[in-house]
Amino acid sequence: MKTLLLTLVVVTIVCLDLGYTLKCNQLIPIASKTCPAGKNLCYKMFMMSDLTIPVKRGCIDVCPKNSLLVKYVCCNTDRCN
């Protein structure tokens, strides 16, 4: 009975991912990446000339301000970019 209880506790910890980490999409290769500590936002960067295709994706700590040439879209859930 103790073994079963211990097994359930371990499975619960693994499933809950107590040290929650954010996963963001990358552009190259097209896959998700686990963000390092402190980088708690995902972002997409677009050139203002073509807002349909992102030119860069990844993890970031603070969402940059848009400029005349570049637009950033930031979010804070897994693979939201």
Curated annotation (Swiss-Prot):
Protein's name in the database: Cytotoxin 1d/1e
Tissue: Expressed by the venom gland.
Subcellular location: Secreted; Target cell membrane
Quaternary structure and partners: Monomer in solution; Homodimer and oligomer in the presence of negatively charged lipids forming a pore with a size ranging between 20 and 30 Angstroms.
Domain of life of the native organism: Eukaryota
Role, per record: Shows cytolytic activity on many different cells by forming pore in lipid membranes. In vivo, increases heart rate or kills the animal by cardiac arrest. In addition, it binds to heparin with high affinity, interacts with Kv channel-interacting protein 1 (KCNIP1) in a calcium-independent manner, and binds to integrin alpha-V/beta-3 (ITGAV/ITGB3) with moderate affinity.
Main location: secreted
InterPro entries for this protein: Cytotoxin_Cobra, Snake_3FTx, Snake_toxin-like_sf, Snake_toxin_con_site, Toxin_cobra-type
Species: Naja atra
Keywords in alphabetical order: Cardiotoxin, Cytolysis, Disulfide bond, Membrane, Secreted, Signal, Target cell membrane, Target membrane, Toxin
The keyword Membrane belongs to this UniProt entry's keyword annotation: yes
Membership in a protein family: Belongs to the three-finger toxin family. Short-chain subfamily. Type IA cytotoxin sub-subfamily.
